[in-house]
Amino acid sequence: MTHPTVIKLHDGNLMPQLGLGVWKAGNEEVVSAIHKALEVGYRSFDTAAAYQNETGVGNALHSAGVNRDELFITTKLWNDDQKRPHEALKESLSKLKLDYVDLYLIHWPVPTIGHYVEAWQALIELQQQGLTKSIGVCNFQVPHLQKLIDETGVAPVINQIELHPLMQQRQLHAWNATHKIQTESWSPLAQGGEGVFDQKVIHQLADKYGKTPAQIVIRWHLDSGLVVIPKSVTPSRIAENFDVWDFRLDKDELVAIAKLDQGKRLGPDPDQFGG
């Protein structure tokens, strides 16, 4: 069994390639989920102000007794707070019971309002102040990313986007890579595997490797060079999703899964969403 892999971000910081997402988890259930995840081997946890569970995440980390330098904690700036990122991050840190986060992300560009460049400039300052180690974005399209780079000279280290076998976003993934922006997949299993887990190629690979369809899809993300954050609060599934280090998909198998792409977006359109 190989060890969990880490990715080196373009600012030099290291990020676990596989983490636990906690979207929709309540403050109480997230505590047991994180404790289970830590026991299994996860060290990266992805939350957000909008998830309203940062307090639970903070309680879980505080009570777990794991050294802070072993953890990689991500949270996100919500749309309504794009004019007050400094205050928003300090509120998040208070709930998380942390002095800093490892990664702070702008949750959505909200281009119709047009504050994301100013918000990004504030994140640059927050990084300089040591309140976040790295800074990035979620759901940014190429024009949004290009504008950040053109106007501030600083590229995000991460662009976290909806990405799964039915929505592979290969052009955006490639653009990110060209600009040394690491792509991170949210909803990596296409919201519980609907339309993915029943695909013939996924079943064939699951049989071949003695794995579940979810493990095959997570391994596809890893072998495609993506950071991936499957969400679960179910102990057995948390463990299952992390048990992916003893096999790899070969090139032909990655190509076969690539053919499942339908451009099927399950979440909001980043050009329209104003949340």
Question: Model-predicted segments: where are they?
Answer:
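N-terminal binding-site loop/beta-alpha segment at the start of enzyme catalytic domains
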Residues: 1-71, 122, 189-190, 256, ...
